[in-house]
Amino acid sequence: MRWAIVRFPGANCDEDARFALEKAGIRAEFVWHTERDLRGFDGVFLPGGFSYGDYLRAGALAAKSPVMEAVRRFAEEGRYVVGVCNGFQILTEAGLLPGALLANLNLHFTCKEVGVRVERNDLPFTRLYPRGQVLRLPIAHGEGRYYADPETLARLEGEGLVVFRYAPLKDEADYNPNGSLHDIAGIVSEKGNVLGMMPHPERAVDEVLGNTDGLPFFLGLVKEVAR
């Protein structure tokens, strides 16, 4: 299995993504943002960071990069695309996922571990998690507040497109770290092949880091190929 990790200027989670994919047994290769051909890959990973310095809006300039036309074709063919943090922002700016990621309600960059509940486990990314499991995953963003108009929110909820939702790790009342509507932490496309999420599963794949809750996310992709 071979995945492309797109490198945008300013991205800084590409090595984390490579480590996580390879730990799951997936061959990972870096692809520069000027690339226009993604043939031969089984999946595409858009990593976190600050592409183009987050100028204009987070992900706005990266969404216009040459590689995104190839990513769009890739997604239209039903192949897997994952965007984490800045990658999620890029997917919404490119129109590959609905909604937008706005500035955190507290107007601060937030970096900590949060509770993330698995809402669906019928996708390659989540099939190794029990539905309803609350994961402990890191976040690190200043613009992670998911927003969509009421009609879009109703469609996301009605069609089961919310995959991850912020949830309490213990009994904390302020478990939503950024003010995301409906506590949304991650969504998927109607085809189920394009996933965007703000928490970082790739930063929670090794005991050395004190947390492996993110590893099944990547192992599930391998299981999908084996089916």
UniProtKB/Swiss-Prot annotation:
Any one GO molecular-function label of the UniProt entry: phosphoribosylformylglycinamidine synthase activity
Pathway recorded for this protein: Purine metabolism; IMP biosynthesis via de novo pathway; 5-amino-1-(5-phospho-D-ribosyl)imidazole from N(2)-formyl-N(1)-(5-phospho-D-ribosyl)glycinamide: step 1/2
Compartments in which it is found: Cytoplasm
Family annotation (InterPro entries): Class_I_gatase-like (IPR029062), PRibForGlyAmidine_synth_PurQ (IPR010075)
GO biological process: 'de novo' IMP biosynthetic process
SUPFAM superfamilies: Class I glutamine amidotransferase-like
Quaternary assembly: Part of the FGAM synthase complex composed of 1 PurL, 1 PurQ and 2 PurS subunits.
HAMAP family: PurQ
Role: Part of the phosphoribosylformylglycinamidine synthase complex involved in the purines biosynthetic pathway. Catalyzes the ATP-dependent conversion of formylglycinamide ribonucleotide (FGAR) and glutamine to yield formylglycinamidine ribonucleotide (FGAM) and glutamate. The FGAM synthase complex is composed of three subunits. PurQ produces an ammonia molecule by converting glutamine to glutamate. PurL transfers the ammonia molecule to FGAR to form FGAM in an ATP-dependent manner.
Protein's UniProt name: Phosphoribosylformylglycinamidine synthase subunit PurQ
Source species of the chain: Thermus thermophilus (strain ATCC 27634 / DSM 579 / HB8)
Gene label: purQ
